[in-house]
């Protein structure tokens, strides 16, 4: 634990509930960096406390200054550190704070309340070592607001908060989506999708009712099983749009999976020259998107390639030949805009916690004139670094390239055991992200916390989040290998429907503001 040792004063304070300590109201946030009193202040200047007040105090080890606010006690505790603001002009405001937490609390969150409307909260992500920036937006309608830091904690649980600001502005996610490419084949193999109470329903409609507003569909050129091709995407697009959702089309430019480890050309393009491949990319992209537009389901966003860290259409489009890769990417971009100029074109990399790799890739792309509108990153916490790494990379990409950014893929397990005959990809406790157990609560917390990090991207450039393969439940014949009907899934413990086919609590993240 990186929490500094308790100063003698704080260590000796009683941890029983005391009468609320109330500071004088002001119209601007006071002492948001907790520097006014030094270490050991039980009631920081400008702030008030309620509950086990001895568990709330300032100590050394601030993020940008010398001190921070901490909550901690050797026994279970509930405490609120708050500041009341009055005389505010009505309008939209945003609380920004840097936080750390060892996790384990029953609740640990920042809140804006008594502002004239519904209380707004953001939970603290689990991050024991590095500071994470989070935001809480609110609309003030009664000229006042209370800023609140809350802990409902077990013995030894701790949090740190520092560098709070309360400024005009707002935040939220435009994209609350999921990849549901697996759904048609699952349904064909007998897959059933149910509400949390057990009523069977349409998988797309169930996700929409939970708050999902964007669907991601991958498209392969000529897959062995006949799924995820143009015809299947067209059919799914009609279902998506009928539910009032937007559509992202994810071009793999392959007959099968394309990712950092493999970017195989479609069999029909195997012998083509580089100039032919540029034409292939344009024609395939235009063909699929044109057909979508013709049936009234125009794509709202398009990925030109999937997890293209090493390029696409190997070897001609490898990053070992950036000039050729740039030409292929621009062919895709041109095709998208020829069909619908308003469609957003995104470039998508894996390893969302790799700041250096992301900079290297996009610096090369920009220097060669690659055109794009948005940046998508995959981030799986059990593979791609800490939440701090992800936030640093996401923030940097948005600022460095001046583009909106989004989380193109993430997921988390709600259990570790397998429902089919194939060992799950994540099936050991040691593979999990600390503070996020493989439970329905752990899965829910993961999604809310990564959504909060995307929401906190400065200047409103955090577009949103796509959950990867929400509907990929275990069904015989719907495994990883499109050429092998006997292949297993390996992902059913990270779907958003449980082994009883019921909607899981993690779907609540679709209602993230």
Language-model regions, residue ranges each:
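Extracellular glycan-recognition surfaces and repeat-rich motifs
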Residues: 27, 33-76, 202
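Glycoside hydrolase catalytic-domain groove-lining segments
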Residues: 203-204, 338-344, 357-433, 440-444, ...
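Extra-cytoplasmic beta-strand recognition segments
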Residues: 34, 79-105, 134-138, 163-164, ...
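Extracellular carbohydrate recognition and processing domains
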Residues: 115-144
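Active-site cleft segment of glycoside hydrolase catalytic domains centered on the general acid/base Glu
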Residues: 229-234, 259-372, 385-394, 400, ...
């Amino acid at each position: 634990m990186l929490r500094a040792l308790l100063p003698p004063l704080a260590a000796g304070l009683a941890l029983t509930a005391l009468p609320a300590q109330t500071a004088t109201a002001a119209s601007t946030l006071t002492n948001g960096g907790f520097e006014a009193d030094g270490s050991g202040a039980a009631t920081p200047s400008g702030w008030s406390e309620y509950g086990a007040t001895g568990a709330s105090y300032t100590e050394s080890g601030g993020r940008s200054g010398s001190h921070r606010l901490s909550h901690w006690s050797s026994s279970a505790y509930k405490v609120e550190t708050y500041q009341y603001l009055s005389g505010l002009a009505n309008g939209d405001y945003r609380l920004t704070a840097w936080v750390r937490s060892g996790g384990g609390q029953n609740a640990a969150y920042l809140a804006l309340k008594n502002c004239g409307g519904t209380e707004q909260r953001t939970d603290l992500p689990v991050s024991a070592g590095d500071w994470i920036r989070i935001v809480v937006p609110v609309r003030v309608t009664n000229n006042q607001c209370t800023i609140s830091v809350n802990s409902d904690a077990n013995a030894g649980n701790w949090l740190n908060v520092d560098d709070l600001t309360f400024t005009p502005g707002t935040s939220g996610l435009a994209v609350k989506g999921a990849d549901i490419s697996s759904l048609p084949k699952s349904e064909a193999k007998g897959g059933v999708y149910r509400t949390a109470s057990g009523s069977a329903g349409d998988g797309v409609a169930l996700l929409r009712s939970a708050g999902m507003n964007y669907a991601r569909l991958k498209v392969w050129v000529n897959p062995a099983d006949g799924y995820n091709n143009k015809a299947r995407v067209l059919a799914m697009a009609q279902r998506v749009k009928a539910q009032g959702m937007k559509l992202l089309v994810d071009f793999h430019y392959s007959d099968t999976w394309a990712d950092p480890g493999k970017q195989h050309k479609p069999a029909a393009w195997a012998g083509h020259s580089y100039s032919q491949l540029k034409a292939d990319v344009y024609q395939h992209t235009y063909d699929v998107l044109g057909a979508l537009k013709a049936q009234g389901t125009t794509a709202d966003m398009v990925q030109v390639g999937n997890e293209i860290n090493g390029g696409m259409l190997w070897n001609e489009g490898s990053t070992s030949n950036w000039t050729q890769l740039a030409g292929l990417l621009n062919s895709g971009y041109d095709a998208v805009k020829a069909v619908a100029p308003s469609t957003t074109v995104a470039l998508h990399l894996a390893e969302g916690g790799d700041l250096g790799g992301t900079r290297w890739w996009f610096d090369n792309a920009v220097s060669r004139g690659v055109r794009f509108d948005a940046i998508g990153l995959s981030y799986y916490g059990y593979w791609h670094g800490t939440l701090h790494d992800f936030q640093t990379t996401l923030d940097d990409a948005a600022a460095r390239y001046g583009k909106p950014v989004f989380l193109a893929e993430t997921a988390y397990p709600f259990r570790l055991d397998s429902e089919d005959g194939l060992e799950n990809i994540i099936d050991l406790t040691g593979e999990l992200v600390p503070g996020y157990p493989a439970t329905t609560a752990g899965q829910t917390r993961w999604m809310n916390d990564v959504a909060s990090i995307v929401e906190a991207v400065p200047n409103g450039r955090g577009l949103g989040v796509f959950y990867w393969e929400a509907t990929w439940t275990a069904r015989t014949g719907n495994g990883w290998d499109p050429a092998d009907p006997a292949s297993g899934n390996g992902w059913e413990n990270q779907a958003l429907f449980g082994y009883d086919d019921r909607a899981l609590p993690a779907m609540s993240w679709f209602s993230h503001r």
